[in-house]
C-alpha cells in the first residue's frame, strides 16, 4: 500500500478520533472521517503492545492491510479510516480476522 494511502502522523490520528464516527465489535474498532476533497481513502492502524510481541502485532497489521487491499474497489473514497485491533484478533487466522473486519466495515456503511 502506497504511503499516500496511510495515516502516519499523530495529528492525523487525533483528528480522526475527535471528528470521526466509530463502530466496533470484539476484535476491531473502526473510526471513519469524511474527507470529501480527498480522491482516495487512507488507513491508519493501531495495534497495542497488549496484543502481543512485534511478530504478532505485525501479522495483525498485515491482515488488516490485506483486507483493505482486497476490498479497495468496494470501499468509499474520500474518507480516512483508523482501525484499532483488540486482543482477540491476536489468536485469529486470516479468514476469521477478515470476516470480523468486514463485519465492522459493513456496520459503518463504508461499501458502495
Curated annotation (Swiss-Prot):
It catalyses: Endonucleolytic cleavage of RNA, removing 5'-extranucleotides from tRNA precursor. GO terms for biological process: tRNA 5'-leader removal. Pfam families: Ribonuclease_P (PF00825). Its EC number is 3.1.26.5. It comes from the Bacteria. GO terms for molecular function: 3'-tRNA processing endoribonuclease activity; ribonuclease P activity; tRNA binding. GO terms for cellular component: ribonuclease P complex. Keywords: Endonuclease, Hydrolase, Nuclease, RNA-binding, tRNA processing. Coiled coil: none annotated. Belongs to the RnpA family. Consists of a catalytic RNA component (M1 or rnpB) and a protein subunit. RNaseP catalyzes the removal of the 5'-leader sequence from pre-tRNA to produce the mature 5'-terminus. It can also cleave other RNA substrates such as 4.5S RNA. The protein component plays an auxiliary but essential role in vivo by binding to the 5'-leader sequence and broadening the substrate specificity of the ribozyme. This is Ribonuclease P protein component. The lineage of its organism: Bacteria, Bacillati, Bacillota, Bacilli, Bacillales.
Amino acid at each position: 500500500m502506497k504511503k499516500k494511502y496511510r495515516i502516519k502522523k499523530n495529528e492525523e490520528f487525533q483528528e480522526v478520533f475527535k471528528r470521526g464516527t466509530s463502530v466496533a465489535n470484539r476484535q476491531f474498532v473502526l473510526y471513519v472521517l469524511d474527507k470529501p476533497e480527498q480522491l482516495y481513502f487512507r488507513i491508519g492502524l493501531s495495534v497495542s503492545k497488549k496484543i502481543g510481541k512485534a511478530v504478532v502485532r505485525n501479522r495483525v497489521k498485515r491482515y488488516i492491510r490485506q483486507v483493505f487491499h482486497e476490498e479497495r474497489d468496494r470501499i468509499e473514497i474520500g474518507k480516512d479510516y483508523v482501525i484499532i485491533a483488540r486482543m482477540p484478533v491476536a489468536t485469529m487466522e486470516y479468514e476469521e480476522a477478515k470476516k470480523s473486519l468486514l463485519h465492522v466495515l459493513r456496520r459503518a456503511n463504508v461499501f458502495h
